[in-house]
């Protein structure tokens, strides 16, 4: 059994005072990044079976996320002509999910090829948490945009311009970068509770509150009498989107932030408990990259039809080529809204019960 005083690979990269703190048995004060960078090795050494199981799960998440989000990126960038604010936010969300997935192979490479090297671990740790925070903020942007488009269509028209959406996306990336660096720079072992609470409120509880409030507002709007059938259906669709995002928040992001707050409040929590909780929470947050494609189905009315059109050929009636472009518009001659898919020289029509997305 190795001695508690033995030097570990990452200790060489830490100041002498930090190494001395480890040898004295106390928790050293160092940035959270240093802790995150070595937790993979600690889990593998302490619970090798759990480590192997989680690596299999992460590998599955990587493959599924790469396929689903790669397909979504192609559909929204190449097959969707109308770049509404929701589509703009969704494209950025897809990019963050792809980067989260791509960070997993980097994690394996660092663990097996550069174990204990803090410089090698920094890109993976920074990229992972940056994209997690971006996912939270872009999901919030999508929900706010859907609420404004459905419940406040006239008053919000000024704020739902493409230029405004692009500016919001730039701000989100910058804000996520600042929050990520702040989180990774928090000193553990000291009085870090206030800073951890502030960051948790800023980048998790506040977005969760926004989504919860807007979901309640749409539910109240649905209860109003006299709504037209089309208006009610569009509000139901928006509520389904908000509820889906709310579930993703609770399942994927709550465990990680709850663990961070718990460790800050109770620094003497058993080390093995904290270690397992961290890795389970990180796995659930990675699962977000596979759950977000559910959200895409509510962004535009034609997303599901477009995806089906890419995979299913219907004889001579449905033969897409590499140059095909899917377009959506509303027929003015029909008695009901019609969803028209223009695919090469062929045209398919189907009722668009939810109406065109604003």
Swiss-Prot record:
Q: Which UniProt keywords apply?
A: Cell membrane, G-protein coupled receptor, Glycoprotein, Membrane, Receptor, Transducer, Transmembrane, Transmembrane helix
Positions of glycan attachment: 16, 24
Q: What is its main location?
A: membrane
Transmembrane regions: 47-67, 85-105, 124-144, 167-188, 196-216, 238-258, 275-295
Matches recorded under Pfam families: 7tm_1
Query: Any ranges marked Cytoplasmic in the topology annotation, and which?
Result: 68-84, 145-166, 217-237, 296-358
Q: In which tissues is it expressed?
A: Ubiquitous expressed with abundant expression in intestinal tissues.
Q: Does the keyword ATP-binding apply?
A: no
The residue ranges for the Extracellular side of the membrane come to 1-46, 106-123, 189-195, 259-274
CDD domains referenced in this protein's UniProt entry, alphabetically: 7tmA_GPR20
**What Gene Ontology cellular component terms go with this record?**
plasma membrane; receptor complex
Task: Write one Gene Ontology MF term.
Answer: G protein-coupled receptor activity
The record gives the membrane topology as: Multi-pass membrane protein
Similarity-based family? Belongs to the G-protein coupled receptor 1 family.
Tell me the function of this protein: Orphan receptor with constitutive G(i) signaling activity that activate cyclic AMP.
What name does this protein carry?
G-protein coupled receptor 20
Q: Origin organism of this chain?
A: Mus musculus (Mouse)
Organism lineage reads as: Eukaryota, Metazoa, Chordata, Craniata, Vertebrata
Q: What is this protein's gene name?
A: Gpr20
């Amino acid at each position: 059994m190795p001695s508690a005083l033995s030097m570990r690979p990452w200790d060489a990269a830490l100041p002498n005072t930090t190494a001395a703190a480890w040898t004295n048995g106390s928790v050293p004060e160092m940035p959270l990044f240093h802790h995150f960078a070595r937790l993979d090795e600690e889990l593998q050494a302490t619970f090798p079976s759990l480590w192997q199981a989680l690596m299999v799960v992460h590998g599955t998440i990587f493959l599924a996320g790469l396929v689903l989000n790669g397909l979504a990126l192609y559909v929204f960038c190449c097959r969707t002509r109308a770049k509404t604010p929701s589509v703009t936010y969704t494209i950025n969300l897809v990019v963050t999910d792809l980067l989260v997935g791509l960070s997993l192979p980097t994690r394996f490479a660092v663990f097996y090829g550069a174990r204990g090297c803090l410089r090698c671990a920094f890109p993976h740790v920074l990229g992972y948490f940056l994209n997690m925070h971006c996912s939270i903020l872009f999901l919030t942007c999508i929900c706010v945009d859907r609420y404004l488009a459905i419940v406040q269509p006239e008053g919000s028209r000024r704020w739902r311009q493409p230029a405004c959406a692009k500016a919001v996306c730039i701000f989100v990336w910058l804000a996520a970068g600042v929050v990520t660096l702040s989180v990774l720079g928090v000193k553990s072992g000291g009085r870090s509770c206030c800073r951890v609470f502030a960051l948790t409120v800023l980048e998790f509880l506040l977005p969760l509150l926004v989504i919860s409030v807007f979901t309640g507002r749409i539910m109240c709007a649905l209860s109003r009498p006299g709504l037209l059938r089309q208006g009610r259906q569009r509000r139901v669709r928006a509520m389904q989107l908000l509820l889906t995002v709310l579930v993703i928040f609770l399942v994927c992001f709550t465990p990680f932030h709850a663990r961070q707050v718990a460790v800050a409040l109770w620094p003497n929590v058993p080390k093995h408990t904290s270690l397992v909780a961290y890795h389970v929470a990180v796995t659930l947050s990675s699962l977000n990259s596979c759950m977000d494609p559910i959200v895409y189905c509510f962004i535009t009315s034609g997303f599901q039809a477009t995806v089906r059109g890419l995979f299913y050929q219907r004889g001579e009636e449905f033969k897409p080529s590499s140059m095909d472009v899917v377009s959506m518009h509303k027929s003015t001659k029909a008695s009901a809204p019609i969803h028209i898919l223009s695919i090469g020289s062929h045209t398919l029509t189907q009722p668009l019960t939810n109406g065109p997305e604003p």
